[in-house]
Amino acid sequence: MEQHSSEISRLKSGETLVDLAFLANDIVKVNGKILIDAPIECVWKALTDYDHLNKTLPKVVASSIVERKGNEVMLDQTGKTGIFFFEKTVNFRLRLREEYLKKVSFEQVEGDFSVYRGEWILESRDSLKGTILSYHAEIKPLFFAPPILVSFVQWQDMPGILRAHKKTAEALCPVQS
């Protein structure tokens, strides 16, 4: 996945990038990116510490591995979602497929969404110090929530989630000055 130079410049300046799109059938597409000042191994460790995500990620109340078979993980999570007066607890089970140091794909197998699937992608390159962590997902809750509300919640929450992964990865591998 090749980034445009303006996107790379924005990431290097510390921006957290979030992009939203409305798809057919009220599905919201979310893309997010952040540059993390840590080696890809540390970003991987932060991203895949599934049993402790509730300690590092905002709005994740519980997170636990149900089963692991090779590169496939079944993960139960509980989170809080919403804005202003509307806050809801959501529960879901995800099937994760790991490609070591490259990607974690996920799809809900049961829970409070009719559509919840996507991937986390890790990318490093010689011309760039650090690791780019990207998030791509398609989301549609089972409960009533207009797409504009879903998109606003994602736009509001995604930067905090990306920054939390950044903070955790950078704490695991502090940069020596």
PLM regions: where:
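Hydrophobic ligand-binding cavity/cleft-lining segments
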Residues: 1-70
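Hydrophobic pocket/interface hotspot
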Residues: 43-44, 53, 96, 122, ...
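Glycine-rich portal/gate segments that line the openings of hydrophobic small-molecule binding cavities
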Residues: 23, 54, 64-110, 163-176
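Residue-level preference for beta-strand/loop junctions
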Residues: 26-28, 71, 88, 114, ...
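Hydrophobic/aromatic beta-strand elements that line small-molecule binding cavities or substrate pockets
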Residues: 31-34, 63-65, 91-96, 117-124
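Beta-strand elements of well-folded, non-transmembrane domains
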Residues: 36-40, 50, 79-83, 98-100, ...
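One face of beta-strands
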Residues: 16, 30, 77-79, 88-92, ...
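Beta-strand/loop substructures that line and gate deep hydrophobic ligand-binding cavities in soluble
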Residues: 107-156
